[in-house]
């Protein structure tokens, strides 16, 4: 598995990321916010996302949202392809997103916004308060 800072070469994955988020929201019957491919592309183009790939196959994704002139940074849109769930990859993606956020936005307060119990547990184990 490769955990990468998403860049323009990863734009081709925007549709599958958007579809995977939509599928997960429907399957779990939760209030997961849908993200359009164009929204995902904007995060990728600005290097504000982590993508996980198995060779060229999409595995997972998480993006960075910025507020208040970079005073605040949130991690959002965490998704893992159903084929790869249960392997601890969501936690690794969140860890990589946290590290990338600290390097890119060193003066920002970092937080996570979620209503999902699994993501809350990951955030807790990573030290989010």
Please annotate each region the language model reported.
Residues 18-82:
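A conserved beta-strand-loop-helix scaffold within acyl/acetyltransferase catalytic domains
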Residues 5-8, 80, 114:
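Conserved residues at beta->alpha junctions
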Residues 1-17:
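A short beta-loop-alpha structural element at the N-terminal edge
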Residues 80, 86-101:
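Conserved acetyl-CoA-binding loop-helix of GNAT-fold acetyltransferases
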Residues 118-121:
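Extended, composition-driven regions rather than compact fold-specific motifs
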């Amino acid at each position: 598995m490769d955990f990468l800072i998403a860049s323009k070469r990863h734009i081709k994955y925007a549709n599958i990321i958007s579809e995977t988020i939509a599928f997960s929201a429907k399957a779990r019957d939760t209030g997961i916010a849908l993200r359009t491919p164009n929204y995902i592309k904007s995060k990728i183009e600005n290097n504000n996302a982590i993508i996980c790939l198995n060779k060229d196959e999409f595995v997972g994704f998480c993006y960075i949202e910025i507020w208040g002139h970079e005073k605040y940074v949130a991690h959002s849109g965490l998704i893992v392809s159903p084929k790869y769930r249960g392997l601890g990859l969501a936690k690794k993606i969140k860890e990589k997103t946290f590290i990338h956020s600290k390097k890119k936005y060193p003066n920002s307060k970092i937080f996570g916004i979620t209503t999902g119990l699994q993501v809350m547990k990951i955030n807790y184990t990573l030290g989010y308060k």
